[in-house]
Amino acid sequence: MIKASVALSLLVICGGVSAISVSSPFEKSCRQHPQLVGKCSTVHGTLSVYNGNPAVRLRRIGTKRILGVSDQRFKLPEYSNIPEALMKQLNGENELVGDFLVCPFTRSKPGEMQLICIESAKNVVTRKRA
């Protein structure tokens, strides 16, 4: 009886793990998104959470330019518009500074927030928001 319970428990646990790992590869990266309007490029900036839409924004360091991570208009269920690891690090009290590989959903226009997705990030430092 105990052996059967242990075996059943292991089967349930292993089945749950394989279900999680099987679903992950199906999420496509930002760079593969079908609605991109240009090439991806690296932006050295500060990623923060704001009140409003889009909530996650990337401010290019040395400029007043703000890029918005699309979370509605260009959100498709099978694509990731921002790496989950970055989202886990962000909250209203901190910001991330680093080099972000971004891909554009809209063209850059003066006075308008350009909508993007983030493919990856390097040299990321978390700091308290000022």
Regions found by a protein language model. Give the residues of each.
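Intrinsically disordered, low-complexity, charged/polar segments
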Residues: 78-86, 119-124
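Sequence contexts marking disulfide-bonded cysteines in secreted/extracellular proteins
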Residues: 29-31, 41, 102-104, 116-118
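Flexible glycine-rich surface loops and low-complexity tracts that mediate binding to linear polymers
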Residues: 83-111
